[in-house]
Each structure stands twice: as C-alpha cells, then as structure tokens.
C-alpha cells in the first residue's frame, strides 16, 4: 500500500520519537516470514517493551538522520524489520531469540552507544543479561551477608535458650 506524503511524514515523526529516546536499534531481514510468525514476534517484542516496525528504508533513514544512529543508515537495504528500545539489550535479545527458532529472520546490524554492530555484535549484545536480571543478582549478593548474619543470630539465640533450658 502506497503512503501519501502526509502519511510518510507521520510515520517518520513516530519513528523519530522512538529513536530519540532509544539506546539501541537492531535491524533484521524478514524475507519469507509468515504473517503468523511476524505476529508472534510483535507480541514478544511488545512484552519486552521493544518498538518493532517494518518500514520503508528511506523513511527509516530519515528518522535516524541527525541522531547517534545515523551511521546505521548504510545497513538499511532489503526488506527489514526494526527493533527500537530504551533498554540496551531488549531488541537484540527479542530478535536473536526469534531468529534461533526461525531461520528466515536474519540479524543484519544494530547500533548501540553510537557504534554500528554487525550480526555477531548484535548476538553478543543479546547474550548480556537484561537490566532486571542484573538488578536481581545484585540484590541477591547484597542480601546474602545480611541474611547469613540474621541466621547466625537466630542460631545463637536458640543455643542460649537451649543452654538455659538445660541449666534449669
């Protein structure tokens, strides 16, 4: 379906707004994917807070102009789906996990912190634990000494009570 000029401007404005608050963009080729599979991918992306969109490459290039992602424009050729997110790892993880189960989705490139990543770089980014996973690990590490100390105090109190009970 051809877009008129106003529709194109609206799409570019919407994508530009997403890019402005993004920390990562991942680009994948979707040639040959069924509508059902694409719908599943969109649902997974939505759950992870990833903006996922199939765009005309010229519109995507206009949306990234003047942003830290401008260098990614060189990689925008062919039928591509764009994953954009504030979370640095989420778009790479969503698209990489889906590509493992569907060989028709091919990771092409990405951009993170102003650097263009190749497919291997996107896969490496996808292997990093998410922010929530890292925070839960940090919380566990911080709680371990406190809970150990609390268990030691409880054991000491129990020992004192048993000694007092035996002495009486």
Curated annotation (Swiss-Prot):
GO terms for cellular component: large ribosomal subunit. PROSITE patterns: RIBOSOMAL_L10 (PS01109). CDD domains: Ribosomal_L10 (cd05797). InterPro entries: Ribosomal_uL10 (IPR001790), Ribosomal_uL10-like_sf (IPR043141), Ribosomal_uL10_bac (IPR022973), Ribosomal_uL10_bac_type (IPR047865), Ribosomal_uL10_CS_bac (IPR002363). The keyword Ribonucleoprotein applies. Gene3D superfamilies: 3.30.70.1730, 6.10.250.290. SUPFAM superfamilies: Ribosomal protein L10-like. GO terms for molecular function: large ribosomal subunit rRNA binding; structural constituent of ribosome. It comes from the Bacteria. Part of the ribosomal stalk of the 50S ribosomal subunit. The N-terminus interacts with L11 and the large rRNA to form the base of the stalk. The C-terminus forms an elongated spine to which L12 dimers bind in a sequential fashion forming a multimeric L10(L12)X complex. Forms part of the ribosomal stalk, playing a central role in the interaction of the ribosome with GTP-bound translation factors. This is Large ribosomal subunit protein uL10. It comes from Ralstonia nicotianae (strain ATCC BAA-1114 / GMI1000) (Ralstonia solanacearum). The lineage of its organism: Bacteria, Pseudomonadati, Pseudomonadota, Betaproteobacteria, Burkholderiales. The gene is rplJ.
